[in-house]
Amino acid sequence: MSYQVHITSTAEHDIMRAADYIEFTLKNPNAADNLLDAATEQIGSLADLPQKFHLVDDPVLASWGIRFVIINNYLSFYTIDEEKQTVIIVRFLYQKSNWTAILRQGFSLI
């Protein structure tokens, strides 16, 4: 059964901010395009089997059902709403950021 994939406005902003940083600060538009392509592909693949990726190691975040997929040097965090058959992408953060603290501050599901 296929799931719908919903990207929150915060996660969309995260993705665009990452691509802008790579393109304009690092001056590497090809890498920015590659990141966007990889994000589109990996996030889209969650529609088929969202359970294939693990829960995060943090016990609090895991209790919230937060999973992640690695996309280049970034982590895309998501939850699964089994009742609605929906995957919700909540954040897209740099792998070396303090993502545990960022996620523990809370996030929007819209």
Language model segments and positions:
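Generic beta-structure capping elements
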Residues: 8-10, 49, 90-92
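PIN-domain endoribonuclease scaffold, especially VapC-family toxins
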Residues: 4-6, 34-44, 63, 68-70
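Arg/Lys-rich, positively charged N-terminal/basic patches that mediate binding to nucleic acids
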Residues: 1-38
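Basic/aromatic recognition patch in beta-strand/loop cores that engages polyanionic ligands
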Residues: 49-83
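Enriched for short, Lys/Arg-rich terminal
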Residues: 71-110
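Generic structural signal for secondary-structure transition and capping sites
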Residues: 27, 44, 48-52, 74, ...
